[in-house]
Amino acid sequence: MAFKLGDVIIDRLQFGYGATKTKALYALTQLTNATIDITADSTDIKDKDGNLIYRKYSGKSGEVTATNAFMNLSVIEAISAQDAEIASSSNTIVMPIFKIVKAGETLDITDAVEDSFIVNALSANGSLGKAYTKGSDATATEFKVDTVGHTFTPPTDNEETQYLVKFKKNVKSGAKLTISGDKYPKAHELYFKALAVDKCEIGSYRACIIHISSFMPSPEVSLALQGGDSQTMDYKGAILTNACSTSQDMVEIYFVDEEEEA
């Protein structure tokens, strides 16, 4: 029997997928929702009494808004329009490190950058206290950096219980992403895959795939630096049309009539 168009129920959005023609850019597996809005300009033609006789539509435009449950570094990379720097044992990246060290304890500082240490007392209520300098040994006014044993020893100040230590380190595993004021994201393909249910066949899932051939991400981003359930990250942008193509396709919707695992 030939497939017939009709009502379908979107059960949930599985993921989003960004790519160029030759390279996958990111996968968003924690999308909580996505909305595609297509709007158009219109011109109303009315008679002498103001009655609407005809409405002419032109100039379609599209906007995409999606929400990811967590911060996604691949999306930040796409928005920043710069390749992320990936740290490895052969390509270390100097990164700032912050540690709270309790009095009487030591800190492993393997791969730390020498002479990059800044040490302050840290009170129980979180305020910064006196600053300390580097010395040949830990004293009431100095801290010790052992470059041979790769150990940091905090001051022996009897008035303090903990210290905030900032230093730089050659990191071998991690990434550095940079958002610059003069760089903007490029257009790429965007896909969404959702699981759909036929209203007459509840419990049987089908794949619904949305393809946007030219998606321009917005460089605007909000990074929620907090715990709890408010770590969402919005991802939005515009749908572009190709002025040099005979086809002005904006969005393609594929409904795959084959059963999918939930």
Language-model features, listed with the residues they occupy:
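Signature of extracytoplasmic/envelope-associated structural regions
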Residues: 1-262
